[in-house]
Amino acid sequence: MKKYLIRLLFATLLLLALCIGASAAGTSGKCGPSAYWSFDSSTGTLTISGSGAMEDYEYENDYPWMDYRDSIQTIVIGDQITQIGRNTFPWTACSTIRFGKNVRSIGARAFYGCRNLNGDLTLPDSVQIVGNDAFSECTGLTGTLTLGSSLQTIGAGAFYDCSFSGNLVIPDSVTSIGRYAFYSRPYLRPETQGTLTLGRNLRTIGESAFCESRYTGSLTIPDSVVEIGERAFCDCGNLNGTLTLGKNLRTIGKKAFSGCAFTGSLTIPEGITEIAIGTFSSLYQSSGMFTGKLTLPSTLKTIGASAFSYTDFSGELLIPDGVTSIGANAFEECDGFGGTLSLPDSVKTVGEWAFYLCKGFTGLKLSAGLTKIEKLSFAHMYGLKTEVVIPEGVTEIGESAFQCSHMPSVRFPSTLKKIGKEAFYFSLNCKIAFPDGLEVIEDEAFALCNVKSAVILPASIKSIGKKAFDSDWSYGKHNDIPLGAYFLGAAPQLVGTGNANCSFPSDWTLNYLPGTSGWMGDTYEGYKIVPWDGETRWDNLYTDDFGYRDNKWNKIETSWSVNPDTGKITLTDDLNEGCVVAVSYDAEGRVTSIGVLRTKTDFVVLNLQDTCRLFLLNASSAPRLNTPVTINDYLPV
């Protein structure tokens, strides 16, 4: 009995000791090789003491003070603690952190979601690393952020969804800023912040690092920076001063500065080879950014889609020799540029809408490297005052490529096969010479154009679309449009054959060469048709004085003279065998005479006036001349 009582007493004492030990373990313990924790429930203070590094916890609910997470008000880090571990204090209710003076590293997600933290946050000068998401979603931090002088790395999302105000200075010691480091969602960020100053040893700025922040004024990217990530400063609409890019910058990510409000000029530094998609686009701003000159580097190879769209640059745009590609919408609605847009021959592709609504350019020189003019790529360039030459090698002009660009004249290459839908809609006020080899003219390609000549279509033409040469304006028919088309080959397919969709104005006559196929009877697809053989009077033929050129627009070196007594014209070179029709016009475009030249010396034109123009056309099976020549003062009164 005595032994039983002794055993019972011993067991009771042991159980009591275990309970007391368990209670003590619940408010204190070890949290690193030489680090310890204790929680004072009366003050809500969690103290980390000892020395060295704290333990890293794999998950955010693994830390030993998890049971007191909602009761913790203050976290005190001892002076000998050097590292705050991963996932050490996430989602705690603390409102105050007291850092020790020797903390060198703050681990990933260390204070993630501590939304009761408020006001300012100051990191001690000893801190070198702020880990990924270390203070992410600490939404109560609305004061200023002060970073220590020894800080080197700011991790991804380190201050994500914080709401700091005031100026931010990134210390000179910092070398990298991680992705989304200072990003805040719209409903959390303040209306305005102070200025942003980047340290002079910074090398990389991560994706969306400052995206949608409210920093104001100018921004200088230090010379030390080599890479700016995608959307790094995207939609920083309060950055309304100048942007200065460092001379050692090599990579600028997509949309890096899209939606900012910078003013002044912009110089892209040498060494940059690509301007990525939307890098400087101002699409969603109420007004465009940049007001001065754009300077591009000689190292540039690629200009991405929407790279500079909706910006307000002024002056000339100089595309460097060596650029091979200009993306879709690259300069869309950049209407402040002036002078001639000259694309170097290195350019192989110009994307859709690339220069849409660039109405300040007065001239356009296209690259010899192009093979296709893309959809709307040069549309609505209202200010063009010089002829546009489509270079040899281009086989297709895309849909609406030059729509509403109002160019005074256009010259087509011998390689052209297809002219797309609305390609020159409401654009031309001139004579048009189509090249041999052209096969397709699509719907409304030349609708609402004031074509100042008969439409002469090569033997290669196969299809003409709906309203291709429509001349009915909403406010009346244009009286200057000629009333006929002249075909040098077989009858093509006319896609538009009825009423409002007809390929030509309904009152046009179609003229064809005898012996060519498909022309039968008196009408074709609803149009009156008549044969012409080179001796038929072309009463409705109009021309402008474009100089003496062949049908490929190459200049012809020749000489000729007019006998003032007889009116006989003598040409010093052969114009190929076959009949040549000559028609002269007065200054108003009215036919004044017609003649036939069968040899180079046997040709008499009657009733010529000194204001007349002479039109020569070789009407043989392979026409080679389509040449207006100014008579000037050689003709008799």
Features from the language model and the residues they span:
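Sec-dependent signal peptide cleavage junction
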Residues: 19-27
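Beta-strand signatures of extracellular beta-sandwich domains
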Residues: 579-583, 613-615
